[in-house]
A protein has these predicted regions:
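Residues forming the flavin
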Residues: 1-53, 57-537
Length: 537
């Protein structure tokens, strides 16, 4: 197979033009190309208004020597490649006396369970929230002014917090073992868009993702796994430092010697109970901030130029800054054509997040602009002190908005005045009840100052970013877990048989990296144990 890199065509080109360009590079006719598979597609907008798409493509040929073709091309961007598909490890020999238990159905838990089910381990998946259909109803009720369900919301339920997000799938994690591409392939097998396999910044969208996780659940069941909703794990039962069972909130016990702890970063009650039970944890760096909304067209023109082609869709952005005081300020979970959503999971507290549908066709762009947090900000290096800091900020947000999402013009946030007025031509795109309020009162002064300094720097890179009519809302407090559950080289915690996993445990940041960690933990279990057999108990 021949791989061509840096294949450059103007945005809006046809499939035929892509074939012709590849053939020209190889000095052959396009009819001699048997197959062409896009491996990567990215946008080059450095020379606006001229916008280009940059490709990496894999090609097979009809009746021509690939090696001779590569040699004749005399092009450093043309090479012979051999596909190395992902390989799940051979099973171990140790007998499983009980079925493995997966705690949490976010990306980490779901993919861990999926891989184990595919390979004969018959896992039991426990999710404290509801299935995705019932969960969506609870979330819509809450957004429309109904009561918060602490067990079924944007944070808890089938698919985890990522179900109500933009569904971004890009990751910076090196993927020499092929886990990342395998994760994307599983998404596609279960209904995601095939384009996510090659787009430089792939995303699914909340509307598609909810169907994908449902299909994955159904396949797990077909493969001999079991999925139980509204099943919150309270703590572990142990003997001589090893796991013997998981104890649920209703007092029931599931006997097992293997449990994957993939509870997500919002299961604060579980963190505290497991810490009290002796599970080793440590504080981890994190960041907090606010959601910032702009007209999507402002971002489109900044990124793609005034006369940008519609085929490019809604433009994303990524910005970072370092303040004069040394703090990092950066965008997080940018949602083109998206919505700010009420992502609260605890009564008396407000947390926000961003969400986009697959079409990304909303009028506004939003992103969290977040500021790095240190131990000095919350005055303790205790493992769970970061959670308490997050809670205090969420309580301030709840108070500022009288139970609704507090919203403010950036011009008022960055000044001492509060007009409580947003121009009619720019309306916030928010899922959930919101109100004009003093958002600046939510953040500590040191973080507000860093936020403003970062916004000013971003305004130099994206004209209008720090415009007074941009809208801020808060608080974005759950960008990542403030806790890491310590695990060893076998991926187990100090309680043998417990496998901390995913973003909540401190080993991932986003859907794809969490799913990859779930696959990695499944590999660790499979490398040790033989597939589950009732007769082998």
């Amino acid at each position: 197979m021949i791989r061509i890199s840096q294949l450059k065509l103007p945005a809006g080109h046809s499939k035929t033009e892509l074939y012709h360009k590849a053939a020209k590079v190889l000095h052959i006719k396009s009819e001699q190309i048997a197959s062409l598979q896009i491996r990567r597609q990215s946008i080059d907008a450095r020379k606006k208004p001229d916008i280009f798409l940059i490709y990496v493509v894999d090609i097979t040929l009809n009746g021509i020597s690939e090696q001779n073709c590569v040699s004749r091309s005399k092009n450093k961007d043309v090479s012979i490649v051999t596909e190395r598909p992902y390989q799940f490890p051979k099973p171990g020999t140790k007998a499983l006396r009980r079925r493995p238990v997966i705690i949490g159905s976010g990306p980490a838990g779901l993919f861990c369970c999926y891989m184990l089910a595919q390979n004969g381990y018959r896992p039991i998946l426990l999710e404290r929230g509801k299935d995705v259909e019932a969960r969506k109803k609870d979330v819509e009720t809450f957004w429309n002014g109904g009561p918060l369900n602490p067990e079924s919301n944007v944070s808890f339920g089938e698919g985890g917090a990522g179900t109500f997000s933009d569904g971004k799938l890009n990751t910076l994690i090196k993927d020499k073992d092929g886990r990342g591409r395998h994760v994307l392939s599983i998404f596609v097998e279960n209904g995601a868009q095939p384009e996510i396999l090659y787009e430089a910044k792939p995303h699914i969208g909340t509307d598609v993702l909810s169907n994908v996780v449902k299909q994955m659940r159904e396949k797990i069941i077909q493969l001999g796994g079991e999925v139980r909703f509204e099943s919150r794990v309270e703590t572990f039962r142990t003997e001589n430092g090893a796991l013997t069972g998981v104890i649920l909130s209703d007092g029931s016990v599931i006997d097992t010697e293997t449990a994957v702890l993939a509870i997500g970063h919002s299961a604060r009650d579980t963190f505290f109970k497991l810490y009290e039970s002796g599970l080793h944890m440590e504080a981890k760096a994190f960041a907090v901030g606010l959601r910032v909304e702009h007209p999507q067209e402002l971002i489109n023109q900044s990124q793609y130029g005034t006369l940008h082609p519609d085929s490019l869709g809604a433009a994303p952005y990524k910005v970072t800054a370092r303040t004069s005081g040394g703090r990092g300020v950066y965008s997080f979970c940018m949602c083109p054509g998206g919505y700010v959503v009420n992502a609260s999971s605890e009564p008396g507290r407000i947390a926000v997040n961003g969400m986009s549908y697959s079409g990304r066709n909303g009028a506004n762009a939003n992103s969290a602009i977040i500021v790095s947090v240190t131990h000095a900000d919350y005055g303790s290096d205790e493992p769970l002190a970061g959670i308490e800091f997050q809670r205090r900020l969420e309580e301030k947000a709840f108070s500022a908005g009288c139970g609704k999402i507090p919203v403010e013009r950036y011009g008022d946030f960055s000044d001492t005045a509060t007009t409580g007025h947003i121009p009619t031509e720019f309306v916030p795109a928010i899922k959930g009840q919101w109100t004009f309020a003093d958002v600046k009162s939510v953040l500590p002064d040191s973080l507000s100052e860093a936020f403003i300094e970062g916004m000013e720097q971003f305004g130099h890179r994206i004209p209008g970013f720090d415009d007074a009519n941009a809208v801020v809302s808060g608080i974005e407090s759950r960008t990542s877990s403030p806790v890491r559950i310590v695990r060893d080289d076998t991926l187990q915690a100090n309680i043998r048989g417990v496998y901390p996993c995913g973003e909540g445990a401190g080993y991932a940041g986003g859907i794809t990296s969490a799913a990859m960690d779930g696959v990695r933990v499944a590999e660790a279990i499979a490398s040790c144990y033989a597939p589950f057999s009732e007769t082998g108990k």
